[in-house]
A protein has these predicted regions:
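Acidic-aromatic substrate-binding/catalytic surfaces of carbohydrate-active enzymes
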Residues: 35-94, 101, 220
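Carbohydrate-binding surface patches
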Residues: 112, 537-578
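Acidic (Asp/Glu-rich), glycine- and aromatic
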Residues: 111-146
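Aromatic/acidic polysaccharide-binding cleft in carbohydrate-active enzymes
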Residues: 443-522, 527, 531-542
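Beta-strand-rich recognition/accessory modules
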Residues: 61, 65-72, 83-87, 92-96, ...
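Noncatalytic carbohydrate-binding groove/subsite architecture in carbohydrate-active enzymes
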Residues: 324, 361-474
Length: 598
């Protein structure tokens, strides 16, 4: 149940300005730069006090109360612009013709100032609201009081005080997802700070699935910037799995051509060659490589490209079923050429996100048919490449894999189950993916790993500690719940880069690793060929994943602390372990190492 508190801040105005200040009672001990969590789409997700997140989520909303409403949120706006300058984070975004410019600035110890400018055409009959959402988990018993320019929310372990720059009238509503406030405010936040020990328990008696290690995507798009990022990542991370692009439309652009003959006669497209060389480099490092296709040639598209329009990044090409044999031969020719001329045998093949259509679209049954038919075609050529079941755009579209999952005739051609982690990774959904892989006795892969598919549009967010924390939280949860064979970062190139500087997304200074890089380096430092170890935490704010290679006596326990600073007490460590190395990554430390005797 969600309670909403709304304050009308704008109606038919050309320009409107209002201010917000967050006061934290002088008990803040974290660096100010880590105090306020601001998402790239403008939402504030709370303020940290001694590491404890005093949670509330702000949003901007435009529309009709109890009616049609547009709300700021992840991937809900068209290219919001995020920027940080010192202690100030700003976002510019537009909702229904109203342009909002929000600045969030840490002003002093425990003091955060928020200012919002709104620009609107006076002909628009729209009402805009500034909302604060309060979760049922921490505010189910909350008491809300308003008086003039002040609103207070008090629960058993939270207290929020909002001070406005003018008198306001609050409207309270009950909804199903949280609690929200629309304001021109100055909030004062405090709460119970939990420094108690986190008790971490390993279950060494029930080891789970193999974790090959962390992987990466290497779809080449930027010849100027990709090489330096790829080199840095491959030289400084243990990368255990790779995924590259099959540039199909460049491999055989003409229907009646012989692509192998063209290539052998010196006509191989440069981008095709670069993709093959990328795969060869990864194979030379000893890792399996997945081949995925985004863009089909025009001749293979049902109705031709002109009959399709790209909307929101999705074009959803249907392949021409009348040309199925030519399509299968064209793709198989690439696999044969890669083997004969580059020594590459691809482990698995997929059409990228064919549940959604980026860019080839399949129905669930077509996906099952493709796995069975193309899998048999490759087997007939003695090629070892298997199919990925799924390679879905999100965890949410699980049902897409059901026809193939329920058809035993497809199983011998499936090398792994795969989904992308952009959306929908709640515990229940993640468990469904893990169970699907177990049902047909194949590994689970996260074919594209990260949290926000639209983040390239506001790339400065990649350098934010909050983004880094959300990402590593997700990976740790996936490792614990799904026990995947690998998570393949999107990407280990300049696209969604783990590095900053030297012109990456226009950034200045030398090329350097971000906090995201160090988070992922810690996870990638898991011992090779380790098994997932079931692990539990006594604190819900501490996410854990554990791995062990019992043969070599090597173990790793990964802990992500979303709460206040606390001690971790680990039980279940094998008796033969006498010393632990502890690595810490945060806004200040980059895999800082200390040794702890057991």
């Amino acid at each position: 149940m969600t309670t909403f508190y709304r304050f009308d801040i704008m109606k038919n105005l050309r320009i409107f300005q209002f201010g917000i200040v967050v006061l934290l009672c002088g008990i803040l001990s974290l660096p100010l730069s880590a105090q306020t969590e601001v998402m790239a789409w403008s939402n504030i997700t709370g303020v940290r006090v001694d590491g404890e997140l005093i949670d509330f989520e702000s949003s901007l909303r435009v529309g009709t109360l109890k009616g049609d409403m547009e709300i700021t949120g992840k991937e809900k706006q068209v290219r919001p612009v995020f920027h940080r300058e010192g202690d100030m984070q700003e976002v510019t975004t537009t909702l229904r013709g109203i342009k909002f410019h929000q600045k969030v600035t840490d002003k002093g110890k425990g003091l955060v100032e928020i200012s919002i400018d709104a620009l609107s055409d006076t002909t628009l009959n729209q009402t805009a609201y500034y909302c604060i959402a309060l979760s049922p988990e921490n505010y189910v018993d909350a008491k809300v009081r308003t008086s003039g320019r002040k609103l207070t929310v008090t629960s058993a372990n939270r207290k929020l005080e909002f001070k406005f720059n003018k008198s306001v009238k609050a409207t309270v509503e009950k909804e199903s997802t949280g609690t929200v406030v629309y304001i021109s405010l100055m909030p004062h936040a405090s709460g119970v700070i939990d420094h108690s020990d986190a008790e971490i328990t390993l279950d060494m008696q029930n080891p789970g699935s193999l974790f090959a290690g962390f992987g990466g995507n290497f779809r080449l798009q930027n010849p100027a910037a990709d090489p330096k990022v790829i080199d840095y990542c491959l030289e400084n991370l243990r990368v255990a799995y790779g995924r590259v692009e099959f540039p199909w439309r460049l491999w055989q652009p003409e229907e009646e051509s012989d692509p192998i003959a063209v290539a052998q006669n010196g006509g191989l497209n440069k981008r095709v060659e670069e993709s093959l060389l990328m795969a060869k480099r990864l194979k030379a490092m000893g890792m399996p490589v997945i081949l995925s296709c985004w863009f089909p040639p025009a001749w293979a598209i049902d109705g031709g490209p002109a009959s399709y329009a790209r909307q929101g990044g999705v074009i959803a090409y249907r392949l021409d079923s009348r040309k199925k044999e030519k399509i299968y031969k064209s793709m198989a020719d690439y696999l044969l050429y890669a083997k004969q001329h580059y020594g590459i045998e691809f482990s698995m093949f997929s059409f990228n996100e064919s549940d959604l259509g980026i860019d080839v679209l399949h129905t669930p049954q077509e996906h099952a048919d493709f796995i069975q038919e193309f899998g048999a075609y490759l087997a007939g050529l003695n090629l070892p490449t298997r199919m990925l079941l799924g390679d879905n755009s999100d965890a949410t579209t699980f049902d897409f894999i059901l026809p193939a999952l329920n058809n035993p005739e497809t199983h011998k051609y499936i090398g792994a189950v795969s989904f992308h982690s952009w959306r929908g990774c709640d515990d229940v959904t993640l468990k469904k993916w893990a169970d699907a892989a177990k049902a047909i006795n194949v590994p689970l892969l996260v074919g594209e790993g990260s949290t926000d598919a639209a983040a390239h549009g506001y790339a400065e967010i990649f350098n934010e500690s909050t983004f880094a924390l959300y990402e590593i939280n997700l990976y740790t949860r996936i490792c614990a719940i799904c026990q995947p064979l690998s998570i393949l970062q999107w990407q280990l190139t300049s696209d969604y880069s783990l590095l900053w500087g030297d012109g990456i997304y226009g950034s200045k200074g030398p090329l350097r690793p971000t906090q995201r890089f160090w988070n992922i380096k810690q996870l990638a430092s898991t011992p090779a060929d380790a098994l997932a170890i079931p692990v539990s935490s006594s604190k819900k704010n501490v996410n854990c994943a554990a791995f062990g290679n019992m043969v070599r006596g090597e173990y790793a326990v990964h802990m992500v602390n979303n709460g206040a600073e606390c001690e971790a007490v680990i039980s279940g460590i094998p008796a033969e372990v006498k010393e632990l190395k502890v690595y810490v990554t945060n806004t200040k430390d980059c895999m800082k190492e200390t040794a702890v005797k057991v």
